[in-house]
Every structure is written in structure tokens, then in C-alpha cells.
A protein has these predicted regions:
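Extracellular glycan-interacting surfaces
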Residues: 1-168
Length: 168
């Protein structure tokens, strides 16, 4: 993982703030951000999920480019532990997408869509749509993944997100 002197702070409705701890400067931008994640192989590349899709910055957060999934709210992001070009995005409605090219293109992993009982997932506040709130990938066995569904429980994949089962 690349080391960086930058601290990312995402505040929903306020934007992404990139604080440079060496230069003691702050860069702000990209409002409506829900989640932000630094690239593990480059201290200047950041990814952000918003209520209007997936964004990427390659210049330390100064500029952002929309990189797809614009019809979804992005609630969670996770990087493959040994392949920094592979990124997972959890959305509202509760779907899971994967990019194998550093966030340039995205493919839905439809195993989440096929889970029985999915129609009962419901977020308790309007608009009552469940979303994938968290994604965790086992650091030594990236075939093993977990997603938390708000509200719907925790699901597990043993094949890098292709199929899923409930664990709670």
C-alpha cells in the first residue's frame, strides 16, 4: 500500500475534504459524497461514492470525474487486498458492483440480486430502500467477502462475490 500524507474526510452533504498533513492545506470538493476511499497503490488517487454515482480523483482530490454507476447511490467501497485495480461498490438499492480496471468500468455481481428473501430487505426510513452499507474482504483469502445490508443482515461470499449466503 502506498503511503500518503493526506487525510480524507467525507461529510454527506458537505463534500470531500483532503487534508495534506505535510503542506498543512485543505482541498474541498465533490459535494453529496457518502463514502470515500484512497487507492492502495497511489497516494494521489481517491474514489468517492455519491448519491449520483462513482467518482475518481487522480490529483489528490482537486478534481473529480464521474466513473459510472450514476443511477445508484454508492454507500460502500472496498479494494481487493492484493489487486489495487479491483474495487467493489455497494449501492442503494442493495446491489454489488466490481471494477477490475481501477474504477473505469463496472459490472454487477448478480449473486446479491439472487438471494432469497431479498424482497424483505428494507431501510427503516423513507424511501425504505435497503443498501449495502459495508464491504469486507478477507486480507489473506480475497475469495471470502462479507457485506452488511441495511436492513437485511450480513451476507457472505466464498467465491469473490459471485454467490452469497446469509450469515445473520
Amino acid at each position: 500500500m502506498a503511503r500518503s500524507s493526506k487525510l480524507l474526510v467525507a461529510m454527506q452533504g458537505k463534500g470531500v475534504f483532503v487534508i495534506d498533513l505535510v503542506e498543512r492545506s485543505v482541498v474541498s470538493g465533490l459535494h453529496d459524497c457518502i463514502v470515500v476511499a484512497p487507492s492502495p497503490d497511489n497516494g494521489e488517487t481517491f474514489f468517492a461514492g455519491t448519491d449520483k454515482g462513482q467518482y475518481k480523483s487522480t490529483d489528490g482530490g482537486r478534481n473529480w470525474q464521474l466513473k459510472g454507476l450514476e443511477q445508484y447511490k454508492i454507500f460502500s467501497l472496498a479494494f481487493h487486498p492484493s489487486d489495487p485495480k479491483t474495487i467493489y461498490a455497494g449501492t442503494e438499492p442493495a446491489l454489488l458492483f466490481r471494477s477490475r480496471d481501477g474504477g473505469e468500468t463496472w459490472t454487477e455481481l448478480d449473486g446479491v440480486r439472487k438471494l432469497p428473501g431479498r424482497s424483505k430487505w428494507c431501510y427503516p426510513a423513507p424511501p425504505y430502500i435497503a443498501h449495502i452499507k459495508g464491504i469486507a474482504i478477507h486480507p489473506e483469502d480475497p475469495e471470502v467477502m462479507y457485506c452488511s445490508i441495511e436492513e437485511g443482515g450480513v451476507i457472505q461470499s466464498l467465491d469473490a462475490g459471485e454467490s452469497w449466503r446469509y450469515v445473520s
